[in-house]
Amino acid sequence: MSENIGKIVQVIGAVVDVSFPNGKLPPILTALEIHNPNSIDAPKLICEVAQHLGDDIVRTIAMDATEGLKRGMDVLDTGHPIMAPVGKASLGRIMNVVGQPIDGLGVIDTKTYLPIHRKPPSFLDQNTSVEPLETGIKVIDLLVPFPKGGKMGLFGGAGVGKTVILMEMINNIARQHGGISVFAGVGERTREGNDLYHEMKEAGVLEKAILVYGQMNEPPGARSRVALTALTCAEYFRDEEHQDVLLFIDNIFRFIQAGSEVSALLGRMPSAVGYQPTLGTDLGSLEERITSTHNGSITSVQAVYVPADDLTDPAPATTFSHLDGTLVLSRQIAELGIYPAVDPLDSTSRILEPNFVGEEHYTVARGVQKILQKYKELQDIIAILGMDELSDEDKLVVSRARRIQRFLSQPFHVAETFTGTAGEYVKLEDTIKGFKGILAGEYDHLSESDFYMVGNIDSAVAKYEKRKESK
């Protein structure tokens, strides 16, 4: 078959217009290849067809920098969408949006490539059974249990710890469950991507992970497609290797933001708050593919940056509708020094029901939320009148709520270098036992500080014993 060659007619930033004089226009979403001898970083530039403009011209979005391109350069129609290298050869590697390795370890030696644009599994193929996934993080396992094969969102403003929780989960799940993890770094800090790579390497979990990066410095085309490349890698392990895969996306807001930039570059009229008019469609095409089938499951954890801490912004609001649970990180809790700064009253999970998690777990979780809600209601009275004006019953509620609040904190493995405290993985039964004891008043003799930054309840008791001895 003869090659379909076009010519560049216009370059405007990340937008490249290509003419195909023979009238053989490549379909929308086809990958085009440009050999750019003037670029050291991207000698082979991939562009994706976004629009047919008429007069045999297609408008494309570049997946890398367009410096060095000139009018009249040859453009090759590959005849297929962007293809991601999948399979065991991609484990332990870092790749970019077009599947090129960026870890300096040579080519990814695989013969299997899949297109990044694919249809979601059909209704008949999907599996709807639900079981909780243990993460080893107390506040999550107790109050916001993750469904296996579900989608959870981590909502929070800037600097409240979304990425640290994601990294801890990757670490815990790789060590405890031995599952395959795929991490999509979408429009986040390159330094964090580098840290994650080295930490996973040191922890020995890199061989069970694939990292796909399209960071802040990349053009919007790459940032709007990198999550699809990562998802394609995860789908292969679910469908062909019949495995349970974890897909981490940091950050889904940057995926939407990149889509908004691309939309503006293509001249579409913006909708609410300047977002793209196709916001719901763009997000749906990604989220609907993240699901469980009879072959295996993809469990997804997505960090969602909340612009100006406003949960009604169209980006987080649209994301909410796709999720099975929401983990809301609170700046007020972070200011108290309690990490992970999960808001126990704002966070929700679809599977926090007795028929999914069991009667004991459900009762303890609701008991914890009830006492924290009562404490929240009493805070105004305490601020105005002080603790002395409370009834004895309310004083007991406050003292237990403050112990629970501190016991919800936990030292993380990935933050050991910053905190100097060894990280702890807490089993679900230990978590339930600890909070059940606090609610029952078994640990009222311990001080609040004994519960701060410990793993299970035995660590809190040991802290109390040590303090008693040193007096």
From Swiss-Prot:
SUPFAM superfamilies: C-terminal domain of alpha and beta subunits of F1 ATP synthase, N-terminal domain of alpha and beta subunits of F1 ATP synthase, P-loop containing nucleoside triphosphate hydrolases
PROSITE patterns: ATPASE_ALPHA_BETA
EC number: 7.1.2.2
Catalytic activity: ATP + H2O + 4 H(+)(in) = ADP + phosphate + 5 H(+)(out)
Enzyme class: translocase
Keywords: ATP synthesis, ATP-binding, Cell membrane, CF(1), Hydrogen ion transport, Ion transport, Membrane, Nucleotide-binding, Translocase, Transport
Subunit structure comment from the entry: F-type ATPases have 2 components, CF(1) - the catalytic core - and CF(0) - the membrane proton channel. CF(1) has five subunits: alpha(3), beta(3), gamma(1), delta(1), epsilon(1). CF(0) has three main subunits: a(1), b(2) and c(9-12). The alpha and beta chains form an alternating ring which encloses part of the gamma chain. CF(1) is attached to CF(0) by a central stalk formed by the gamma and epsilon chains, while a peripheral stalk is formed by the delta and b chains.
UniProt function note: Produces ATP from ADP in the presence of a proton gradient across the membrane. The catalytic sites are hosted primarily by the beta subunits.
Protein's UniProt name: ATP synthase subunit beta
Gene: atpD
